Amino acid sequence: MTKQEKTALNMARFIRSQTLTLLEKLNELDADEQADICESLHDHADELYRSCLARFGDDGENL
């Protein structure tokens, strides 16, 4: 895996993690409409991470 590929994979993993954290916070605030949007965003972030992982290779993290 090249440095650029590793960077892209790390960024995708970070975005996936942050959208999940945001979703938890929105649920705590009972912000249902925003939580629904964030859940969709998290699903896309997870899909992006898995796609990058498949394309660029395994970084040793368990899905």
Curated annotation (Swiss-Prot):
GO MF: identical protein binding
Pfam families assigned to the protein according to its UniProt record, in alphabetical order: Rop (PF01815)
Protein name, entry field: Regulatory protein rop
Organism lineage: Bacteria, Pseudomonadati, Pseudomonadota, Gammaproteobacteria, Enterobacterales
Task performed by this protein: Regulates plasmid DNA replication by modulating the initiation of transcription of the primer RNA precursor. Processing of the precursor of the primer, RNAII, is inhibited by hydrogen bonding of RNAII to its complementary sequence in RNAI. ROP increases the affinity of RNAI for RNAII and thus decreases the rate of replication initiation events.
Origin: domain of life: Bacteria
Subunit note: Antiparallel homodimer.
InterPro entries, alphabetized: Regulatory_Rop, Rop-like_sf
Source species of the chain: Escherichia coli
UniProt entry keywords in alphabetical sequence: Plasmid, Transcription, Transcription regulation
